[in-house]
Amino acid sequence: MPPRGAPRSCRNESRDGRAADDSRTAGKGKGGNAMTDRSDTLRTSIATVSIAGDFREKLAAISRAGYTGIEIFEQDFIAFDGAPVDVGWLVADYGLEIMLFQPFRDFEGLPEPYRSRAFDRAERKFDLMNSMGCDLVLVCSNIAAAALGGIDRAADDFAELGERAGKRGIRVGFEALAWGRHINDHRDAWEVVRRADHSHVGLILDSFHTLSRDIDPQTIRSIPGDKIFFVQLADAPKIDMDLFYWSRHFRNMPGEGDLPVVDFMRAVAATGYDGPLSLEIFNDQFRAGSPVEIARDGHRSLMGLMDDVRRSEPDIRLPAPDMPPRAQCGGVEFVEFTTSEEEAAELAGFLSVMGFTHAGTHVSKQVAQWRQNDINILINTEESGFAHSAYQTHGTSVCDIALRVDDAAQTIERARMLGAETVTTPAGEGELSIPAIRGVGGGMIRFIDAGSDLARLWEIDFVPVAGAGDVSGVGLRRVDHLAQTMKYEEMLTWTLFYTSILDTGKVPMVDVVDPGGLVRSRAIQNDSGELRVTLNGAENQNTLAGHFIDRTFGAAVQHIAFACDDIFATAEALAARGFEALAMSANYYDDLGARFGLDEAFLSRLQTFSILYDEDAQGRFFQFYSRRRSSEIFFEIVQRLDGYDGYGAANAPFRISAQKRDLNGSPFTAATGN
């Protein structure tokens, strides 16, 4: 908001009447991105400490992402090279309001002379707030050694502070820090507020401070909504460490971590609270990342969170976005490669070896359909358009993935409302325009459903190849999973992207040991197992994943896994067609037999076809890989038995070592001599 007593600033006009910098309004209301549309309902905010950049860069990113306002963290104000009144004007110029000033530390329970000094400090903060146009200050519970305990003592302090603040048009919000010296629980903070009994004193709730201490969020439901002045939200991975260090370095956006933030927010909503929702995120990666991307992720997380709350607490007063539900996904309809005419011949030859049949040709484009059972691989050799641009950037690579969903139109609408970039690609007369959004590495994710003409894709857009015949191939049935590679710092972004748009969950992250360093891996999957995507985060280019990113200039899909019903029959059929499996060392099979107590005949069979093996309490897993190709993409064939739900993570270090040997041109020779 503008400073108190000053005329309201026009969003697109600066204080001196000049047109505001275009960056302040860039993206608003454009491009089908609903996150940039201002809402008159749900009020959203983010603390300036949550993202990187100087103050102006932060405001530009926050405004562009579609927030209503900000929390000004004192450090950002102190570092700003202008007066408090200039802060107010600058925030207003970006179409934002200052919803909170924080933090005011070490206040309650102090003996004299510290108590008087604390009130003097508060008066000076009130001066700043009046100048910048902010009417709510966050007071966090005292951690000072001099602080004295006692609810009544603290309540008396807040009653006096509320009286002083009220005369200045300011409200005081009390927050219990999880590591507070005497008050570290929102229930105690509420009791202080209740006993203070002042209209200008209320409670501030922070999901991290409650959930990190395993405090039942249902205890919030008994607090009157009008006495909750502000709500801060943060998630975090479950880590056993010091609360302060955990909070200051590992918070993340709601939905990116492991805390029950939805349960917390349901309890808040049940109180009748209808004020702002704000993100207060301390995260080392975020503070070194792109302000625009982090702000966008935050807004997406708030919209997705409130949609979850609305569906489980339908009678809440707090405004919530009205968006379609998360999409139910029935698997991968097709994977499209972009390539050149020359490299297409190599790719087509390899698919033929793997048992795929050239089944169709696009009616107007240079796109060939290769099929095996429910797997469709497209090879695009167009010399213009999106696919060609992707080829020029990444080389032969996956440019498109199409997913089968329950309702394509609703999926696109939900994605749009959550800030995904929707894309419309040209279609010829009578051809289908398949709805799409931009995904990892700039690739397309398209959506196809059974309730529209999209279900007739192969009939409408493709001409069958004469004599294509049987497409059963070597027994590859469907796409088991897609492995997407990215920089490690992007993993939270794409985790939230998938889990907020599609009805999927995230599997705990695992560390994959590569001779060149660690790769972090996390699977995104739905309950049926029909959609599985593994996200692999590379921290340097010495790992196989990092090498892929470097060589392909950021392409996403590094490998595709196909499911079969009989791993040995498929492996034998592939070997007969000239397929070269990635050879594993004899040491791997010796260790495998010792680990699982496998008999020699079974081990010999595995080694013959270079098949890797894993098992857990649920079932068994078989996998083998193609050797490296010039495109940097490789293929995996898997079989899951008896409910095995993993990805053979224990085998990953040995597979990567074998691939690096192959990459360097010195592969082991499989037992078959291939």
What are these regions (language model features)?
Residues 55, 64, 293, 310-360, ...:
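Glyoxalase I/VOC metalloenzyme domain signal
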Residues 67, 129-134, 228, 273-274, ...:
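A structural motif
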Residues 69-70, 160-258:
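Acidic/histidine-rich catalytic cores of soluble enzymes
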